[in-house]
């Protein structure tokens, strides 16, 4: 899926994308993260998608925007989508008891007066069920079959009464997958393929566990240990809890699912759910006591900085993934990593923080006169990475100036320096920084070699040398 070049080429958007790219690559390199892939979606277009580092370190196979990752619990959002399709088709109701569709379901409990577990409870994680089925599969990675999972219910009991507390449960969503099968008459994987993936054109997405030797799949790695070592992570098939955590996809393919969330109108074709049902899934159905977070139908909903977002994260051995959507801005960010210590949530939050406002600004200016001075194309010769013994810096082309950032910082925009050209002085700029420690007002001078390439930069009285990579 090609990025939306018209929006990505707007100076303010391009500058913010360069910052995201520089920050992600720096964070990846300093943390030793093998690889990562990200995509940013606005409404029905992919604004930007890229890979960083390695899909397979040993084979030197780069991570790209098309690299596939195990998305683990993001699978739950597809299971919820299937449930709502079946609800809209009249095959079930959200407040149906679980036992109505799964007559074999029974679990002990000490809450005799509690309402029976319903399908809605499964999707909102308010069923009170245990987090997992009755097996230690996160220890030995021997996931039970659906049959063994059902047999194991006889050894389990509900932890809480229904509707008393939000309690995340893989078991609940595994049972929701069983409901999909019972209500549709199709195996879960076939239903998702035929009714969700195919209509959305998600050709690179797999419902069942992938072949570990698939050349398009990112290799899974464990966390980095105190001695700096990082070994491979085990390949797993989640079997009986597949409806909770088994799918595989790329950031560009998952972008198609993100685009669905912004659509409206009746169901049909790629509109696999009517707009009103999508809104129903995306609104709060269970609110946390702090009123800052809640749960929709399959989606985690957060409120921060005056903005509401929804989405889901995923975690399987060797993979950490995140899908986050800001409906008011029609913005979605997807991040996938191939190690146990990846931090895709911070990646999506930073990307939204840096790119969201410029996209909104670019759209607002699309039909208005833009009097801002465009950056001089000759400034591209200064763009690059620089290093001193004290730290790193990256020079980027902004919307009307050069930007100098330290991409190794957790939030480099807190220390950004804008470089304004000094008239009549070649290769010379003036530092414009809000932080008084950051050489504000001093000269920034680039030195070039005979070929016109920047070799170092003087900031104030001290130098950083140009480097090819971190």
Annotate the PLM regions:
Residues 10-71, 93, 104-108, 146, ...:
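Short, conserved catalytic-motif segment at the N-terminal edge
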Residues 307, 328, 345-470:
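Peripheral terminal and inter-domain segments
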Residues 2-9:
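Acidic/histidine-rich, surface-exposed loop or edge segments in extracytoplasmic proteins
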Residues 54-57, 317, 340-342, 410, ...:
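A short acidic/small-residue loop/turn micro-motif
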Residues 32-35, 317-320, 391:
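Short, small/polar residue-rich loop motifs at catalytic or cofactor-binding pockets
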Residues 311-312, 322-339, 457-459:
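Short, well-ordered beta-strand elements
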Residues 21-24, 44, 68-95, 173-181, ...:
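Active-site SXXK
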Residues 54-56, 110-325:
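Short, surface-exposed loop or secondary-structure junction motifs
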């Amino acid at each position: 899926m090609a990025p939306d070049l018209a929006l990505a080429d707007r100076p303010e958007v391009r500058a913010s994308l360069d910052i995201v790219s520089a920050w992600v690559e720096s964070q990846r390199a300093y943390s030793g993260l093998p690889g990562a892939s990200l995509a940013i979606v606005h409404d029905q277009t992919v604004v930007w998608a890229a890979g960083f580092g390695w899909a397979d370190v040993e084979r030197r196979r780069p991570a790209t925007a098309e690299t596939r990752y195990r998305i683990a619990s993001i699978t739950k959002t597809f299971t919820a989508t299937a449930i709502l399709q079946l609800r809209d088709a009249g095959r079930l109701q959200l407040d149906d008891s679980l036992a109505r569709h799964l007559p074999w379901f029974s679990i002990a409990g000490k809450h005799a007066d509690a309402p029976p577990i319903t399908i809605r409870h499964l999707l909102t994680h308010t069923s009170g069920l245990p987090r997992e089925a009755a097996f230690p599969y996160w220890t030995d990675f021997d996931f039970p079959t659906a049959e063994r999972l059902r047999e194991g219910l006889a050894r389990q009991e509900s932890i809480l009464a229904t509707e008393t507390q939000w309690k995340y449960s893989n078991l609940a969503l595994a049972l929701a997958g069983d409901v999909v099968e019972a209500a549709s008459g199709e195996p879960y994987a076939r239903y998702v393929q035929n009714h969700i993936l195919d209509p959305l054109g998600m050709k690179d997405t797999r419902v069942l566990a992938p072949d570990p030797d698939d050349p398009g799949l990112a290799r899974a790695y464990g966390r980095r240990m105190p001695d700096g070592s990082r070994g491979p992570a085990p390949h797993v098939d989640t079997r009986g809890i597949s409806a909770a955590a088994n799918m595989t996809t790329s950031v560009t393919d998952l972008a198609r699912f993100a685009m669905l969330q912004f659509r409206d109108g009746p169901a049909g074709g790629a509109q696999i759910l009517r707009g009103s049902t999508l809104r129903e899934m995306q609104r709060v159905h269970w609110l946390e006591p702090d009123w800052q977070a809640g749960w929709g139908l399959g989606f985690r909903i957060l409120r921060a900085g005056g903005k509401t977002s929804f989405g889901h994260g995923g975690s399987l051995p060797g993979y950490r993934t995140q899908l986050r959507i800001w409906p008011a801005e029609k913005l979605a960010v997807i991040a996938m990593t191939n190690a146990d210590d990846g931090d895709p949530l911070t990646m999506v939050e930073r990307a939204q923080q840096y790119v969201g406002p410029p996209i909104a600004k670019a759209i607002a200016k699309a039909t208005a006169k833009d009097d801002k001075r465009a950056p001089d194309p000759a400034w591209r010769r200064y763009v690059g990475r620089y290093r001193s013994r004290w730290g790193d810096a990256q020079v980027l082309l902004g919307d009307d100036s050069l930007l100098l950032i330290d991409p190794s910082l957790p939030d480099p925009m807190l220390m950004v320096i804008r470089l304004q050209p000094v008239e009549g002085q070649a290769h010379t700029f003036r530092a414009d920084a809000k932080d008084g420690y950051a050489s504000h007002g001093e000269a920034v001078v680039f030195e070039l070699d005979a070929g016109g390439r920047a070799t170092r930069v003087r900031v104030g009285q001290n130098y950083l040398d140009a480097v090819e990579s971190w």
